[in-house]
UniProtKB/Swiss-Prot annotation:
Taxonomic lineage of the native organism: Eukaryota, Fungi, Dikarya, Ascomycota, Saccharomycotina
GO cellular component, one term: membrane
Name of the protein this chain belongs to: Putative uncharacterized protein YGL074C
Entry's transmembrane regions: 51-71, 86-106
Additional remarks: Partially overlaps HSF1.
Source species of the chain: Saccharomyces cerevisiae (strain ATCC 204508 / S288c)
Subcellular location: Membrane
Keyword annotations from UniProtKB, A to Z: Membrane, Transmembrane, Transmembrane helix
Organism superkingdom: Eukaryota
Principal location listed in the UniProt entry: membrane
């Protein structure tokens, strides 16, 4: 399998997962609780993308944990509404594509 095929397949899978996460998070208004840091509120949807990204996009458990921590960090410091994501979709897509490419290349 060529590297171009790996990148293309990775982009497709990441786009599917990301849009699935966004639709799921926008349809949910379940609150996990409120954080005390700068008045930020930690909501269920603010953790959807980090959890999905960590579970499905990282090639190893260590990278999965690091990815989850990095993606969920803004949820603690940024005040957002229940229908917004802590990071832009573009940023999540970029990290997801990088992780998928690494995951696929490790299998080759």
């Amino acid at each position: 399998m060529a590297v171009e095929d790996v990148v293309l397949a990775s982009v497709r899978s990441v786009v599917k997962i990301s849009f699935g996460c966004k639709i799921f998070s926008m349809s949910s208004s379940f609150k996990l609780g409120k954080g005390s840091i700068r008045g930020a509120s930690l909501t269920f949807d603010s953790l959807v993308v980090p959890v999905f990204a960590a579970l499905f996009m990282a090639p190893t458990i260590q990278l999965s944990f690091c990815l989850f921590c990095f993606l969920s960090l803004p949820a603690l410091f940024v005040k957002h509404t229940s229908n917004s994501l802590p990071l832009s979709t573009g940023t999540v897509l970029l990290f997801g594509i990088c992780c998928q490419v690494a995951k696929s290349l490790l299998k080759i």
